[in-house]
Regions:
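Acidic/histidine-rich alpha-helical segments that form the ligand environment
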Residues: 88-139
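Amphipathic alpha-helical packing segments from all-alpha helical-bundle domains
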Residues: 27-37, 104-107
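Short coil/turn linker and secondary-structure boundary residues
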Residues: 41, 54, 92-95
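Short, contiguous alpha-helical
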Residues: 1-28, 35, 43-86, 121-170
Length: 170
């Protein structure tokens, strides 16, 4: 692949994107980053399967796995990774949820550091695409988690309204 030139502007944009994807927009509330969203979730909520298959904890563990693979060996061919194990069963209690969040925060910081320490100058297309892919991937999972949380809120409201209606009938 032909190397591209990493400008300071592109480097700054990628670092800003890291901050947005994981932290969100702190000055407005239109987007909560992945870590900001996960810090509002407790271990019970993270373990609950709302749609009957995936949980918030599984999404978080999957993103952690993917970031760790990239941060540890960014030149590793994607086909050499057993991506299926990233969706393994995740048993969460308060301690393991706190550990998962701590590890995920560390990997997000490693990605931002990687972007920040890239030297301006030649950058392989593969490396650039890998960074952009990780940011897009984490943003996708932030959105998936947001949908799980909204659906869970909807279910809780629907159940609460149903209980209120039942009380009226009694």
């Amino acid at each position: 692949m032909t190397p591209h030139i990493l400008s300071r502007e592109l480097q700054r944009a990628l670092r800003w994107q890291c901050q947005q994807v994981f932290g969100g927009t702190h000055h407005t509330h239109w987007f909560e980053g992945l870590l900001t969203k996960l810090r509002r979730v407790d271990s019970v909520q993270a373990s609950r399967s709302v749609f009957g298959n995936s949980t918030i904890a599984r999404h978080a563990a999957h993103v952690l796995f993917c970031l760790h693979v990239m941060n540890t060996d960014p030149d590793r061919p994607p086909e050499s990774v057993d991506w299926g194990q990233s969706w393994g069963d995740v048993q969460i209690d308060d301690e393991t949820w706190a550990d998962l969040l701590h590890l995920l925060t560390g990997e997000a910081e490693r990605l931002e550091t990687l972007v920040g320490t890239l030297q301006t100058g030649p950058l392989s297309t593969d490396r650039l695409l890998l960074i952009i892919n990780q940011l897009t991937h984490a943003a996708y999972h932030a959105g998936a988690i947001a949908q799980i949380l909204k659906y869970e809120t909807y279910l809780n409201q629907d159940v609460a309204e149903g209980v209120q209606e039942a009380k009226v009938l009694i």
